[in-house]
Amino acid sequence: MTGSISGEADLRHWLIDYLVTNIGCTPDEVDPDLSLADLGVSSRDAVVLSGELSELLGRTVSPIDFWEHPTINALAAYLAAPEPSPDSDAAVKRGARNSLDEPIAVVGMGCRFPGGISCPEALWDFLCERRSSISQVPPQRWQPFEGGPPEVAAALARTTRWGSFLPDIDAFDAEFFEISPSEADKMDPQQRLLLEVAWEALEHAGIPPGTLRRSATGVFAGACLSEYGAMASADLSQVDGWSNSGGAMSIIANRLSYFLDLRGPSVAVDTACSSSLVAIHLACQSLRTQDCHLAIAAGVNLLLSPAVFRGFDQVGALSPTGQCRAFDATADGFVRGEGAGVVVLKRLTDAQRDGDRVLAVICGSAVNQDGRSNGLMAPNPAAQMAVLRAAYTNAGMQPSEVDYVEAHGTGTLLGDPIEARALGTVLGRGRPEDSPLLIGSVKTNLGHTEAAAGIAGFIKTVLAVQHGQIPPNQHFETANPHIPFTDLRMKVVDTQTEWPATGHPRRAGVSSFGFGGTNAHVVIEQGQEVRPAPGQGLSPAVSTLVVAGKTMQRVSATAGMLADWMEGPGADVALADVAHTLNHHRSRQPKFGTVVARDRTQAIAGLRALAAGQHAPGVVNPADGSPGPGTVFVYSGRGSQWAGMGRQLLADEPAFAAAVAELEPVFVEQAGFSLHDVLANGEELVGIEQIQLGLIGMQLALTELWCSYGVRPDLVIGHSMGEVAAAVVAGALTPAEGLRVTATRSRLMAPLSGQGGMALLELDAPTTEALIADFPQVTLGIYNSPRQTVIAGPTEQIDELIARVRAQNRFASRVNIEVAPHNPAMDALQPAMRSELADLTPRTPTIGIISTTYADLHTQPVFDAEHWATNMRNPVRFQQAIASAGSGADGAYHTFIEISAHPLLTQAIIDTLHSAQPGARYTSLGTLQRDTDDVVTFRTNLNKAHTIHPPHTPHPPEPHPPIPTTPWQHTRHWITTKYPAGSVGSAPRAGTLLGQHTTVATVSASPPSHLWQARLAPDAKPYQGGHRFHQVEVVPASVVLHTILSAATELGYSALSEVRFEQPIFADRPRLIQVVADNRAISLASSPAAGTPSDRWTRHVTAQLSSSPSDSASSLNEHHRANGQPPERAHRDLIPDLAELLAMRGIDGLPFSWTVASWTQHSSNLTVAIDLPEALPEGSTGPLLDAAVHLAALSDVADSRLYVPASIEQISLGDVVTGPRSSVTLNRTAHDDDGITVDVTVAAHGEVPSLSMRSLRYRALDFGLDVGRAQPPASTGPVEAYCDATNFVHTIDWQPQTVPDATHPGAEQVTHPGPVAIIGDDGAALCETLEGAGYQPAVMSDGVSQARYVVYVADSDPAGADETDVDFAVRICTEITGLVRTLAERDADKPAALWILTRGVHESVAPSALRQSFLWGLAGVIAAEHPELWGGLVDLAINDDLGEFGPALAELLAKPSKSILVRRDGVVLAPALAPVRGEPARKSLQCRPDAAYLITGGLGALGLLMADWLADRGAHRLVLTGRTPLPPRRDWQLDTLDTELRRRIDAIRALEMRGVTVEAVAADVGCREDVQALLAARDRDGAAPIRGIIHAAGITNDQLVTSMTGDAVRQVMWPKIGGSQVLHDAFPPGSVDFFYLTASAAGIFGIPGQGSYAAANSYLDALARARRQQGCHTMSLDWVAWRGLGLAADAQLVSEELARMGSRDITPSEAFTAWEFVDGYDVAQAVVVPMPAPAGADGSGANAYLLPARNWSVMAATEVRSELEQGLRRIIAAELRVPEKELDTDRPFAELGLNSLMAMAIRREAEQFVGIELSATMLFNHPTVKSLASYLAKRVAPHDVSQDNQISALSSSAGSVLDSLFDRIESAPPEAERSV
């Protein structure tokens, strides 16, 4: 190396700079791992660049080098390495070419097998636990093959269904692999599976897949079937451009090579069952011959068609018992299986060089062929022995040295002996008797995975070699008699076995034989454990975890998965190793987040925060784009110092320590003290000289720290004295010169200490200049930002100006400095400054610098003595410098980093930039932060500075630990299959008569009908057993029921009602079966014609699809509780002979297999325990139905008549049965001459019922099979549900107010009335009467700052004719929130009480009253958020005289109220919740069939539920509006639709399938023109008139009252207030049958944070009252949160506040039950809230007064403060989940992750501890433990009784309206109390 290039890092930076200068890209666009070609380097550029590099490095660099090392990182590493000699290079190449037997390292593995196996570790656990993944074929897997003629159906029915199946084979993460949904649909799922597992294997290997681009990496993939391609091309109309590549076998390997851009061999291998082991053999060969440098070997197998099953069945190869019993005497064939496995291979020398984990070593392998054996598929023992000998010869190993062989071991009676004899002959003979060859087969666990079988055995064997244990061979009980194990010196491993101790590395072989004769054997050996070299194993003090993903959601998912893993399986993996793997062994992705942590606990907490998208210490969430190029280092002046700064950096950051050490001699010389010692000892800098010198030293060292991580400045800016450090970094001064300037300046200033000062003001420059105009000695010293300035001058004048600014409610504060720089006070120092620095000889800066010293920013300063004299005197034009940098003519800079020990300027920087360039993207960062971990803070900011790719960190050579692989985000991809061609209908599905499904379009907008057609053949029945009535084969009623229930389930229903059996289905001749679902009706009919439809149809059963499928589970539970247990006096009887009982009644045989385990009879009740077959297909209810139907007919054993089902009132399905034992409970409710009626419940033991039948009616037959029909008994409504509803449906009842008792803590005596400020145009009339009562009233707004009481008299008239109710509400709301803000900012020792007066809102008859109504909701929230300043709200009659109200107001001011108060005729009323009583005034809602119904917000989650509810009540036409339009119906099938849009479309389709016409309209309900256009369009089209309204539109925007803005308020009020007013005008009273307003309990309960939302909902309540009085059926429903969806974002806040009062949220089912209940009553406003239990006699409960944990009045002030601090620390630490001792009492809560929910929880605990109610904003106003304790001490500390303590007492009695309402709940009727 020559010149200044001294290593790889320098070369990397040089190359980046070269590309930026010559190619035209920006630094942020240069990815060092991207190929030079992708960065724009052409061949011509390469020639020029090679010349530049040759000159720079002093040796020849060829352009060809750029292609051999195609990235910046690769090229820098190559050029930095010593130049190899030509001779040695040739020798290496010659040696490598001759190394054809080099060992191959296995460096990574991945797998996916049935049984939940998704990684090698899971496979190992699965094997060791002796588990099996074999089951029957999934129900839907063969559905496309169930068509065809009866003979095909018969063949399918006789085909073995045992197998080992992967779930969700249609799931694939297409987005991750950049594959369109259309292409993914046509891709063979084997291709998809291989992509995912290969990626996982590379991550397991620690090889970032992205680094393999254009590398000589080979792919060798074993696969042997392409069933998906055949299925996809069966219908030519479905073939498209993706079909060929989607179905071709070769693409299985090629697809992976294409995606990863691999340039080595890419081969799909098909040798049938040996494919994947042959793939491993070929991969090893390719590595040894240098065809590739890394190889991916794989095998994949999926079973999509029954064809191969049937073929193997025909030759007897498949096990009829469903088990692979390898080497066992009972072996009867194999079981087919699915799965995929991938291994990553390297030459062993390469793996050792690269520091890879070597899982095992492949020593040798061989492949051969059986040739002409005893048949194409018959094994050849001689060939098997030959391949074994060849493999061990290739491995250079004696056969007797192998310890274990993973055998092919399929479990065939003759195949196993042939393989065993070959193994024994070659590998077993000659072994000691006590050291036999151990053998086993993974097929006994996973089945025969065919093309993946070899790799499954290989991965198992590698794991065994690693762990030193051999998992057992399953199902081995008796040795196969044809295998002489003793003679062959072999033993089957039948238990978990320790690897034999042999004195040599563990060695094993793996065999795999293809059924066409291709044999393979691979020899592996234990890998050598790599131990870190001395010193390498030291963990860094701080670790950075880089969590990457293609999207932010993927980053979140990965972070959550890592946190779970680190707490669980990865608990023993060192944090540094986890970080190392994430940072260096995972591919870079477009999005990444980072977590910096010192220990595992911090790391897990950070990962959880990252997963949730929350801010937390050390966490940087993914950047939403890059801010652009250009980095500015900003050097602040004085003020960032703190004791302990830099100490951790000295210990943990070598670059920082080196910079301090390099600076130390110069620093000691210039400063006179040691910077190193000050930092290392955590000493505090004292005095001007020490502070300023220490800070510049710190800044210079921090600059080197940033640069060491590759972050270098393109421009520097200095703030005041910070310009010295900026000049040094820019190269204008040396460090010694910079220290000299600082020392001189500090020394000259020191004598002026105490004679001046500075203050930071929240004022812009013009305002500041006007402020100081009368103070000539005060100057504007610093232009900080558009909103901040700093003044300098004499101390007394500075303090006076601070007071003036604060009086204007603006921020002003002294700056911690004892002199006044940038002020005329410096004039006297300038001559000395010029004199002492006269010999200073600055240089031209090498880095751009903008000086803040001169008014003209374009001045090119010379940093000499004159400059520094001017610098200390002139104002600092920091704002102007930052604005110039952010928008300069030479190009804007976008990243600003403040180089300081604590950020002083970051906010000023961002304010300035956003003001100068609105909408532009900038980043403003600090470096360190006071009193935090230096290293964690710096690394966090370092990570924030990197938005395109994470910062480079050291890459130690030690192996990485395996951590969880990328979590996939699967979506469904499958072809649209058509059933095989043939005659009409298909074969019925198993257990049902359902066949091919067709959707039939209907006229107009009605939902489609559904048709299922099947052909029933006598020899291919869909059930296994027989079922004969008097010698005639009849389809059992259970199969018929199973058929229509299955159809209902496919349509989204889980219940049927009004089931009627009409005629039996004779199964002794072919029949065509049709099931038709049209709207709610479903029926089953058949025709005797076998080939085509006939007109001779017989209807067999009819039913109605249940209208409330969601209620099925609850009805099942209810029914089970009533009937699920036998009576107390029941006795267990002997089990009768079931077959005999059935035979007595003429029934022969059962269609399904089930047996009776116990029989318990008592009177009309019978409970029978039944056992189901273990292999019951998942989701099958056929056997359960069969048992229920047959046993119900036997409920009276003594009655021997034949009973046949006639009808069922309702049948409901619940949970799937999970065990073999179930209980059938029968309750006979009627028994007469005509028949019996039975209620039936079926449930597994201790589980939720899975099946319920209510009123199953049987008809008694004397002879024959003529099934009649019986009418079910009249149904009864769910009375119990309505009883529950009365517990949480309330109205507001107004009762006379009671005066608080002066003896309890809520009372107060006001003895010193204070000033009253009356705000409002109508307030003058109150003044005189209040003055007479001892108050000092004034109609004013300026007097608010001094008033004890503030009375806001609500305006009653709009500001103009065009002001709408929304405009009015926004205007008044803005006034009041500003008023609250002013009062909240007053000092705690000057409290005030806010009162609001409204008129006529209680009745809401007059328009002016309706306009004011929103204030009721706003008042409740103010009371909840600021109980300390709340007085109350009083509503006067519309015509009340304010002057006459004065005395009453004077009395009320002394009695603050939580509640809204209404004053009528001199009586003050307060609200209370009252249960709805009396007889209903109307019947339950029923919609007109000829009308339409409008739901605003109808496309939201809540609106769609309401649409379903109206449909249940007979609505046939629904108009659903939402602001976001749905796509055209032609696009509803697109896969690109997002999840939410898909949910809406599916809900609409479900409604249409029920016969409901749905019109989805994009309309803004608050916009009068939109609604008018909708109605006009309907009128033009002659649409049905709208006869009902549900106004459900609304949004939330939670903000504290003091933070509310006019725009935010309008956003919330627009749909609620504006929308309801538009609807009110469009549908006046009398024009509709009902007018429902969906409001929120927030409107009356005062939920903190929901001021605008509560206000809007109060308006809805008032509108409902107004319309009611005009005779319209209008109701405002004040909901609490709906569980699961509720009031959107506010649901949890509402639930938290309700929980505080002992209430809760409600389920949708409860909500609709309550709605139906209250709709029958004449109620305008219904409050739906679960009522808390009433308080006990002792006064405890929801309405108990707060009792403090301490008696504060008897404690000293210091004791109060100490107790409060300790108690608060305990409460806050518990909620924040940090150790109490680690909670810094001076640290802001926001830095600890405080959110609004936590704040509310802390507030509740603090209220109980302190004994008074507290403000919702308390924690934000007092953001540390110390400041909060200080605030509360003022509230509770003892002092003299005065005005102050009276107001303090006032705050203790105030609170939320929610508290008040619960305090005043009226007594419920006795039955309600009992239910409570």
Curated annotation (Swiss-Prot):
Disordered: annotated span: 1102-1130
Region C-terminal hotdog fold: start-end pairs: 1130-1267
Known pathway: Lipid metabolism; fatty acid biosynthesis
Domain (Ketosynthase family 3 (KS3)): residue spans on this chain: 101-526
GO CC, any one term: cytoplasm
Gene3D superfamilies tied to this protein: 3.40.47.10, ACP-like (1.10.1200.10), Malonyl-CoA ACP transacylase, ACP-binding (3.30.70.250), Malonyl-Coenzyme A Acyl Carrier Protein, domain 2 (3.40.366.10), NAD(P)-binding Rossmann-like Domain (3.40.50.720), Polyketide synthase dehydratase (3.10.129.110)
EC number: 2.3.1.292
Positions of post-translational N-acetylthreonine modification: T2
EC main group: transferase
Alphabetical list of InterPro entries matching this protein: Ac_transferase_dom_sf, ACP-like_sf, Acyl_transferase_dom, Acyl_Trfase/lysoPLipase, Ketoacyl_synth_AS, Ketoacyl_synth_C, Ketoacyl_synth_N, Malonyl_transacylase_ACP-bd
Residues that, per the record, bind NADP(+): 1491-1551
Region entry Beta-ketoacyl reductase, spans: 1491-1728
Function (record text): Part of the PpsABCDE complex involved in the biosynthesis of the lipid core common to phthiocerols and phenolphthiocerols by successive additions of malonyl-CoA or methylmalonyl-CoA extender units. PpsA can accept as substrate the activated forms of either icosanoyl (C20), docosanoyl (C22) or lignoceroyl (C24) groups from FadD26, or a (4-hydroxyphenyl)-C17 or (4-hydroxyphenyl)-C19 fatty acyl from FadD29. PpsA initiates the biosynthesis and extends its substrate using a malonyl-CoA extender unit. The PpsB and PpsC proteins add the second and third malonyl-CoA extender units.
General remark: Was identified as a high-confidence drug target.
Protein name, per record: Phenolphthiocerol/phthiocerol polyketide synthase subunit A
Organism whose genome encodes this protein: Mycobacterium tuberculosis (strain ATCC 25618 / H37Rv)
Gene: ppsA
